[in-house]
Amino acid sequence: MHFSIPETESRSGDSGGSTYVAYNIHVNGVLHCRVRYSQLLGLHEQLRKEYGANVLPAFPPKKLFSLTPAEVEQRREQLEKYMQAVRQDPLLGSSETFNSFLRRAQQETQQVPTEEVSLEVLLSDGQKVLVNVLTSDQTEDVLEAVAAKLDLPDDLIGYFSLFLVREKEDGAFSFVRKLQEFELPYVSVTSLRSQEYKIVLRKSYWDSAYDDDVMENRVGLNLLYAQTVSDIEHGWILVTKEQHRQLKSLQEKVSKKEFLRLAQTLRHYGYLRFDACVADFPEKDCPVVVSAGNSELSLQLRLPGQQLREGSFRVTRMRCWRVTSSVPLPSGGTSTPSRGRGEVRLELAFEYLMSKDRLQWVTITSPQAIMMSICLQSMVDELMVKKSGGSIRKMLRRRVGGNLRRSDSQQAVKSPPLLESPDASRESMVKLSSKLSAVSLRGIGSPSTDASASAVHGNFAFEGIGDEDL
């Protein structure tokens, strides 16, 4: 998650008397909450009590007198760095103190009272699931409510997550972000004030070996099946005509497990696909389509001659990556403390081991750069869990004073319709992709992005290349 405080506001108190400075905290470029300095100071003091002063980053000190515009700007920058440092710390960023502070602030900022509401959550194929939740329910609460509605066992809930998406005209989803523990899903989706934004349930792991755990259960099997059919229909999974025929035959026989077994062998099975964007690979300003999955980032690009090619970047060969944000300066080329900002430009850059002893930066410019970074981190986390012999099965916390809330009524996951015939353009694209070798990974210069613009994510799953790989 990318935390920023891009602007401040001068606001009046509840009584309409004295004014105060409000700091607008954004997550992934969208307003999350509006807080005062005193509220952030209270958070800092609470974290210091729980974890000690040595663990915490520096916090801007109190001032006896009113701040000048320049001092407000300086404090904004210091608070932004503080919030980013706390969030990136594994201990502090996952603490209930930090997350509950952000949830309360989000609810107060949007002025949403705590009450029971009906929240619509979509499955990957568009099926609607209505759950009764509180407006103050956090992400895990809503996920549990959806699981209860579908009768998904508790020990399989950890295999799924809720995602905030924007529904496009063709029915496909453009992923905004995975909903986090510091936000309230109802408030997050309604505060955007657009019917395009939805909450979607989707599997949250990358390694298809975990499918076996989910497929043991009827509901889990149906969820995977519905997601896979949807991904094929939208062209996320690459399918030839013959493979499409085999899949449709298995559908007609209602052989869901066999359908999934075949789908697992297909290119881009289980991948998340992003909107078209721009990369500096294999040349500057190259239009690409990025997909994430199977411990890699895939870049599909069309070269001169209309040939579609694919470059695959393994996460184990990424030494580190960073997300940078920049805002064009207003006309005149100077920044002012007024905090008036234009559209944010986001870039994901990763340092890749192209060959033995040769690292090279690759940069992707996309509004979804932060989501791509989150995918990289979750793939690394999953690799580390598997390497240590751990499991992603999630034993849910029990609430104080009782068991998990269960739904009064349950809803079955409907089987999606049979696959439609693939269009000709998609078929030709698959043929080219399967026959041509990967694009050259040589001759690309390092980007001019300023590394100080954001934190660099080190990769604990980074591996060297042996002679046998060359």
Swiss-Prot record:
Region (Disordered): 401-425
UniProt membrane topology term: Peripheral membrane protein
Ligand binding (a 1,2-diacyl-sn-glycero-3-phospho-(1D-myo-inositol-3-phosphate)): 36, 38, 62, 75
Main location class: cytoplasm
Pfam family, one: SNX17-27-31_F1_FERM
Domain PX stretches: 1-109
Family: Belongs to the sorting nexin family.
Protein name as annotated: Sorting nexin-17
Species whose genome carries this gene: Rattus norvegicus
Recorded name of the encoding gene: Snx17
